[in-house]
C-alpha cells in the first residue's frame, strides 16, 4: 500500500474519524488561477492541455501549492469519452464544447465504438500516472467521469444545451435508441474509471451535471439506472485500500435516498440542498460532499467564513463530511477568497471532530 501523508479525504468518504473536515474544490485547477492561464496558453488550447501529461499534471498541482487542500483531482474533461468514440470534439469561442457528428438515431449508436482506455484514452492514464508520481503521497488523487446521461446530452444535442429538447425528443420518441446509447456509455465509463483506478486514482467521482433536468421517473430510468450499473462494475479496492465512489447529480437533492441505494460511498450535494436535511435522510448510509454556493466566494472574507460555519453546523458532529462547493468554482473569483474558504473549513471544523 502506498503511504499517504494525508488521507483525511478518503477517511471522510468512508465515514471514518478525521481530525478536521477535509476540503477540495470542484474545478480547483482552473481559470481563476493566473498560473493556470499561463500553462493553458503554453499548451495552445484546452484539449492539448488535457492530452499533455506533464502540463495536465502541472495544472493539477497548482492549487495544491497555493492552498492546503486535502485532495487533488485529475485535470481532464468529461467529454474525453465521447471524443474517443469519434464524435469530433471541438471548442467554439464563447459557445463551449461542440461535436461535428452528433448522435441522431439508433444506427449512429450502433456505429459507436467502446473506447479502449489504455489506447484512445491512454493520454488520460498517462496523466494519472504522472500526477500520482509527482504528488509523492501528499494527498489522494481523484479520478472522474461524466455520467452516461450527462455525456449523452452533449452527444445528442451536439454540444451544450439550455432546454435539452433534442435529447428529450429522443427519450420520448425513440427510447430504445437512447437506452442503447446509455448502455454503451455505461460500459465505456466503467472501463474508463477502472483504468484510472489501475493507473493510480485513489477515489473516483461520477458527475451527473444534467440529471436534474429530468422528471423523477425519467431520472431513475435514464440516469440513475446507468450510474448504478457503473458502481456495480467498479474496482472497489486497489493497492490494499478501498477506492471510494462519489455520485453527484446537480439538481438531484430530491433523489438522495435512491442515489444512496446504488452502493456508492458518498453523494455530492449542490448548494440548493440543505446539508442537515441531507444528513438526516441518508447520512447513515453514505458520506456527503458539499455544498457552499460557488458564488459565495465573491463575498467578503468574513461572509465566506460565516457561510462555512453555517454549513459545518448544519452537518454537525461526527464523520462523513467532505467540504466542497456545490458546483465548480467560477473563473473570476479572487484566488485569495478560495484561500479564505479552505483555511476556514479546517479551522472551524476542528470542534466537530473532538
From Swiss-Prot:
Gene Ontology MF: a single term: uroporphyrinogen decarboxylase activity
Localization: Cytoplasm
One CC-aspect GO term: cytosol
UniProt KW keywords: Cytoplasm, Decarboxylase, Lyase, Porphyrin biosynthesis
BP terms from Gene Ontology: heme B biosynthetic process; heme biosynthetic process; porphyrin-containing compound biosynthetic process; protoporphyrinogen IX biosynthetic process from glutamate; uroporphyrinogen III biosynthetic process
Pathway annotation from the record: Porphyrin-containing compound metabolism; protoporphyrin-IX biosynthesis; coproporphyrinogen-III from 5-aminolevulinate: step 4/4
Enzyme Commission numbers on file: 4.1.1.37
InterPro entries (alphabetical): UROD/MetE-like_sf (IPR038071), Uroporphyrinogen_deCO2ase_HemE (IPR006361), Uroporphyrinogen_deCOase (IPR000257)
Catalytic activity: uroporphyrinogen III + 4 H(+) = coproporphyrinogen III + 4 CO2
Binding site for substrate: 27-31, 46, 77, 154, 209, 327
Pfam families xref list: URO-D
Domain of life: Bacteria
Site (Transition state stabilizer): 77
Keyword Signal belongs to the record: no
Subunit structure: Homodimer.
Similarity comment text for this entry: Belongs to the uroporphyrinogen decarboxylase family.
Primary role: Catalyzes the decarboxylation of four acetate groups of uroporphyrinogen-III to yield coproporphyrinogen-III.
Alphabetized NCBIfam families for the sequence: hemE (TIGR01464)
Name by which UniProt lists this protein: Uroporphyrinogen decarboxylase
Record gene name: hemE
Amino acid at each position: 500500500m502506498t503511504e499517504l501523508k494525508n488521507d483525511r479525504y478518503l477517511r471522510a468518504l468512508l465515514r471514518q474519524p478525521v481530525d478536521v473536515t477535509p476540503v477540495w474544490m470542484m474545478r480547483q485547477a482552473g481559470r481563476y488561477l493566473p498560473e493556470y492561464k499561463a500553462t493553458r496558453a503554453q499548451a495552445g488550447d484546452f484539449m492539448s492541455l488535457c492530452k499533455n501529461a506533464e502540463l495536465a499534471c502541472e495544472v493539477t498541482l497548482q492549487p495544491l501549492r497555493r492552498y492546503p487542500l486535502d485532495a487533488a483531482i485529475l485535470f481532464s474533461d468529461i467529454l474525453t469519452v465521447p471524443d474517443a468514440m469519434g464524435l469530433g470534439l471541438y471548442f467554439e469561442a464563447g459557445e463551449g464544447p461542440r461535436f461535428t457528428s452528433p448522435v441522431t438515431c439508433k444506427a449512429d449508436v450502433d456505429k459507436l465504438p467502446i473506447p479502449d482506455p489504455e489506447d484512445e484514452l491512454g493520454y488520460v492514464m498517462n496523466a494519472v500516472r504522472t500526477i500520482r508520481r509527482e504528488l509523492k503521497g501528499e494527498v489522494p488523487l481523484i479520478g472522474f467521469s461524466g455520467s452516461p446521461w450527462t455525456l449523452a446530452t452533449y452527444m445528442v444535442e451536439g454540444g451544450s444545451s439550455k432546454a435539452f429538447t433534442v435529447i428529450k425528443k429522443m427519450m420520448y420518441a425513440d427510447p430504445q435508441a437512447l437506452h442503447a446509447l446509455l448502455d454503451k456509455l455505461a460500459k465505456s465509463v466503467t472501463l474508463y474509471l477502472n483504468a484510472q483506478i489501475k493507473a493510480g486514482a485513489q477515489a473516483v467521482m461520477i458527475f451527473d451535471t444534467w440529471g436534474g433536468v429530468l422528471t423523477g421517473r425519467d431520472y431513475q430510468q435514464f440516469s440513475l439506472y446507468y450510474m448504478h450499473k457503473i458502481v456495480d462494475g467498479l474496482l472497489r479496492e486497489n493497492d490494499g485500500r478501498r477506492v471510494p465512489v462519489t455520485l453527484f447529480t446537480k439538481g438531484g437533492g430530491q433523489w438522495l435516498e435512491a442515489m444512496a441505494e446504488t452502493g456508492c460511498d458518498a453523494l455530492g450535494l449542490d448548494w440548493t440542498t440543505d446539508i442537515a436535511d441531507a444528513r438526516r435522510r441518508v447520512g447513515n448510509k453514505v458520506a456527503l460532499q458539499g455544498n457552499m454556493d460557488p458564488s459565495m466566494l465573491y463575498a467578503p472574507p468574513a461572509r465566506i467564513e460565516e457561510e462555512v460555519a453555517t454549513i459545518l453546523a448544519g452537518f454537525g458532529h461526527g464523520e462523513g463530511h467532505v467540504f466542497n462547493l456545490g458546483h465548480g468554482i467560477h473563473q473570476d473569483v479572487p484566488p485569495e477568497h478560495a484561500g479564505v474558504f479552505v483555511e476556514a473549513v479546517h479551522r472551524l471544523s476542528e470542534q466537530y471532530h473532538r
